[in-house]
Amino acid sequence: MSIRATAATPGLLAYLRGINPAEHPALARLRERTAQHRMGKMAVAPEQAAVLAWLVRLTDAENYLEIGVFTGYSSTAVALALPEHGRVTACDINAAYTEYAREAWQEAGVAHKISLHLQPAIFTLDELLAAGRADSYDLAF
């Protein structure tokens, strides 16, 4: 299995690869590991995660909400792009899949930025609303 952007033309992919920084070593290892996973096709492509990271930098985002973590490629890429005080709220229901993510977050040195909620995202969203955090996110994916 390979992880690739399915809706991008070869020209667009070449452009994105040319303007984006090199893939972080922790992301490269996670991508390779995820590609071997039986559900590996669920992962975002490196170019998609790079666009998310670019949006973080472009908008000076500090708080990011992710619904559906899988093995953590996009959450790791975003956490790397966030400022040191930035935070990721990550929602998923599968502890086995997110174990890959936890390992990647540690390896990339961003685990301290990420709060993983292992329950249906609707419950986490309800909790965030009840805590008065309706307007606290700069970017969601």
Give, region by region, the residue ranges found by the protein language model.
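A short alpha-helical cap/connector motif
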Residues: 1-141
